[in-house]
Swiss-Prot record:
Subunit: Found in a complex with ARL3, RP2 and UNC119 (or UNC119B); RP2 induces hydrolysis of GTP ARL3 in the complex, leading to the release of UNC119 (or UNC119B). Interacts with RP2; interaction is direct and stimulated with the activated GTP-bound form of ARL3. Interacts with SYS1. Interacts with ARL2BP; the GTP-bound form interacts with ARL2BP. Microtubule-associated protein. Does not interact with TBCC. Interacts with RP2. Interacts with PDE6D; the interaction occurs specifically with the GTP-bound form of ARL3.
Modified residues (Phosphoserine): S5
Family: Belongs to the small GTPase superfamily. Arf family.
Gene name as annotated: ARL3
The protein's name in its UniProt record: ADP-ribosylation factor-like protein 3
Location(s), subcellular: Golgi apparatus membrane; Cytoplasm, Cytoskeleton, Spindle; Nucleus; Cytoplasm, Cytoskeleton, Microtubule organizing center, Centrosome
PANTHER family to which the protein is assigned, alphabetical: ADP-RIBOSYLATION FACTOR-LIKE PROTEIN 2-RELATED
Keyword Chloroplast belongs to the record: no
InterPro entries given in the database record: ARL2/3, P-loop_NTPase, Small_GTP-bd, Small_GTPase_ARF/SAR
Annotated function: Small GTP-binding protein which cycles between an inactive GDP-bound and an active GTP-bound form, and the rate of cycling is regulated by guanine nucleotide exchange factors (GEF) and GTPase-activating proteins (GAP). Required for normal cytokinesis and cilia signaling. Requires assistance from GTPase-activating proteins (GAPs) like RP2 and PDE6D, in order to cycle between inactive GDP-bound and active GTP-bound forms. Required for targeting proteins to the cilium, including myristoylated NPHP3 and prenylated INPP5E.
Residues noted as binding Mg(2+) in the record, renumbered to the chain: T31, T48
Length: 182
């Protein structure tokens, strides 16, 4: 087999599909993050009623991202989307300190879910462009992330608005797609 035929075969190989669940409290920036990933306009975003799905190509993967609304009345329905999740991305509004306890509680409950057991989790400490944003290290400490032992995890500072840190987080996602512990 010549080099050209090997290259053709590699080029025609289908991307590995990855199911990503994008969760977090309302107003954390999930939809802005999703639109930033898809290189879409982020100037007119309204609260998500239900869910959005987008497919994004990245590093040989087809990332199917499910963005589920974070309003309190929608959260009980999150579990309907757990099945076959490869990566969980949890978005936190780093500037909304009064909701850290609530967001920490929701994240802890997600990490206890059987259908999400061992699923790698990326926590985006979003809105780092705001002066009042808590650093990712402070959030990690406050949420006791260091106690997570049953899966690979990462906390990533980002600003969905400016795009800063988003690609770093997605690089981690692509590196850890197959890290789901059995």
């Amino acid at each position: 087999m010549g080099l050209l035929s090997i290259l053709r075969k590699l080029k025609s190989a289908p991307d590995q599909e990855v199911r990503i669940l994008l969760l977090g409290l309302d107003n954390a920036g999930k939809t802005t993050l999703l639109k930033q990933l898809a290189s879409e306009d982020i100037s007119h975003i309204t609260p998500t009623q239900g869910f959005n799905i987008k497919s994004v190509q990245s590093q040989g993967f087809k990332l199917n991202v499910w963005d589920i609304g974070g309003q309190r009345k929608i959260r009980p329905y999150w579990r309907n989307y757990f099945e076959n999740t490869d990566i969980l991305i949890y978005v936190i509004d780093s500037a909304d300190r009064k909701r850290f306890e609530e967001t920490g509680q929701e994240l802890a409950e997600l990490l206890e879910e059987e259908k999400l057991s061992c699923v790698p989790v990326l926590i985006f400490a979003n809105k780092q462009d705001l002066l009042t944003a808590a650093p990712a290290s402070e959030i990690a400490e406050g949420l006791n992330l260091h106690t997570i032992r049953d899966r690979v995890w990462q906390i990533q500072s980002c600003s969905a608005l400016t795009g800063e840190g988003v690609q770093d987080g997605m690089n981690w996602v692509c590196k850890n797609v197959n890290a789901k512990k059995k």
